[in-house]
Amino acid sequence: MARQKIRIRLKAFDHRVLDQSSQKIVDTARRTGAVVSGPIPLPTEKNIFTILRSPHVNKDSREQFEMRTHKRLIDILEPTPKTVDALMRLDLPAGVDIEIKL
């Protein structure tokens, strides 16, 4: 029989909220008897936006803004039905994007 695996990818702009959420997921999975691999930090995605400072002239005067997206990966090996139920009931902050693959 093939081993089951749940792969959870977390994304957030604030790395502190992301680390707290990933720790909650790992603690919940371990409490229900599943084997957990992670959280594994993935490369941070950095979007840079460059805009002109003035509305009309002075092309040389520009301002740059950046938006960083932090990511984590958690693998739950050999999940039990109790693990899946506990993860569905878990309450996480609003700033964290969760992607789950079975």
Curated annotation (Swiss-Prot):
The keyword Ribosomal protein applies. GO terms for biological process: translation. SUPFAM superfamilies: Ribosomal protein S10 (SSF54999). GO terms for molecular function: structural constituent of ribosome; tRNA binding. SMART domains: Ribosomal_S10 (SM01403). GO terms for cellular component: ribonucleoprotein complex; ribosome. Involved in the binding of tRNA to the ribosomes. Keywords: Ribonucleoprotein, Ribosomal protein. HAMAP family: Ribosomal_uS10. This is Small ribosomal subunit protein uS10. Belongs to the universal ribosomal protein uS10 family. Part of the 30S ribosomal subunit.
